[in-house]
């Protein structure tokens, strides 16, 4: 009888192999100061964790304020304190140390430097995004490009450089890459609709007080606009209930804890970013990951945990 059990065990191990660490999804979110704030990426994380395939996934926000994919920086950026950082200065470290299986990248807002359309700037953005995708895929990671959000959505009459139209061109190019097999999540149409609806209900609603950085409700709008495409690419249900209140506060605090730890671990050249804890001291995924939506799921998250946010 004992020998029979011994013979059966190898067969069972073949039929039901143990899950290796490599099978756990490892998601890297890249971008500028808007995703760095943590709100919409943390909402996206909460949506992913509501699905069994991503409940215990590693999800880290590597976004960095001021950053571009193009490598461009306007003269006197940040009053001359430092040039804009470029994701390509630190991408190799992220890919080699974190080893993502999926990269979600949202660039463009800084790449045109808030200037009128320039063919040279546009080409630098195109090359930067193409290079980013190629590097991610060469590291065996899937790649999802997210279009840049809106500029001066509350006061378009003040957009003298017609920069939102420049971002339309950048987004249009990304959408055109779908014909080449790119996975692209276009937030701009859904975001525009939500802002328009919010202003119809409340003429005093402000999406982004400075024209660039959304408030908490704006981040929720971005998450709602990005989620359907990301869910489709990952074969997840399109419906999602985003958390709010204390449930979201816990997710955001943990999200930012992991963000700063991994930014410190992989390195960057951007001044003003708080140092993170050593990654060895980060909590285990199941201990901090909440997947429960609050009683008013979908309401705008409360303005918490953004004390480490820095401008573009």
Features from the language model and the residues they span:
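Sec-dependent signal peptide recognition
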Residues: 2-11
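Hydrophobic h-region of N-terminal signal peptides that target proteins for export
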Residues: 11-19
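Serine-esterase "nucleophile elbow" of acetyl-processing enzymes
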Residues: 20-66, 70-73, 80-81, 91-99, ...
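Solvent-exposed loop/turn segments at secondary-structure junctions
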Residues: 33-36, 64-70, 102, 108-114, ...
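Extracytoplasmic/secreted envelope proteins and their assembly/folding machinery
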Residues: 41, 45, 88, 92, ...
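Conserved catalytic region of serine esterases and O-acyltransferases that act on ester linkages
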Residues: 53, 180, 200-312
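A short helix->loop->beta-strand "cap" motif at the edges of active sites that frequently abuts
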Residues: 137-142, 182
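Substrate-gating cap/lid alpha-helix
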Residues: 153-189
């Amino acid at each position: 009888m004992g020998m029979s059990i011994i013979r059966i065990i190898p067969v069972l191990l073949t039929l039901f192999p143990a899950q290796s660490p490599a099978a756990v999804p490892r998601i890297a979110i890249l971008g500028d100061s808007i995703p760095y704030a943590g709100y919409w990426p943390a909402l996206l994380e909460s949506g992913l964790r509501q699905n069994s395939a991503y409940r215990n996934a590693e999800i880290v926000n590597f976004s960095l304020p001021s950053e571009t994919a193009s490598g461009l920086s306007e003269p006197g950026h940040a009053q001359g304190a430092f040039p804009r950082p470029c994701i390509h200065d630190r991408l190799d470290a992220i890919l080699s140390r974190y080893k993502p299986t999926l990269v979600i990248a949202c660039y463009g807002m800084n790449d045109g430097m808030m200037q009128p359309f320039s063919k040279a700037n546009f080409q630098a953005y195109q090359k930067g995004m193409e290079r980013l995708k190629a590097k991610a895929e060469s590291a065996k990671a899937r790649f999802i490009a997210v279009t840049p959000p809106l500029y001066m959505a509350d006061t378009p009459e003040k957009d003298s450089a017609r920069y939102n139209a420049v971002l339309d061109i950048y987004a249009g190019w990304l959408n055109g890459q779908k014909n080449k097999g790119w996975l692209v999540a276009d937030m701009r149409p859904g975001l525009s609709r939500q802002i328009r609806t919010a202003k119809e209900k409340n003429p005093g609603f402000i999406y982004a007080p400075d024209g660039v950085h959304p408030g908490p409700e704006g981040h929720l709008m971005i998450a709602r606009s990005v989620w359907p495409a990301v869910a489709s690419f990952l074969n997840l249900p399109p419906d999602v209930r985003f958390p709010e209140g204390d449930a979201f506060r816990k997710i955001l605090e943990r999200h930012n804890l992991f963000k700063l730890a991994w930014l410190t671990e992989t390195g960057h050249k951007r001044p003003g970013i708080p140092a993170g804890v050593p990654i060895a001291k980060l909590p285990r995924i199941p201990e901090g990951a909440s997947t429960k939506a609050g009683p008013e799921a979908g309401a705008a998250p409360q303005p918490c945990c953004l004390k480490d946010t820095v401008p573009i």
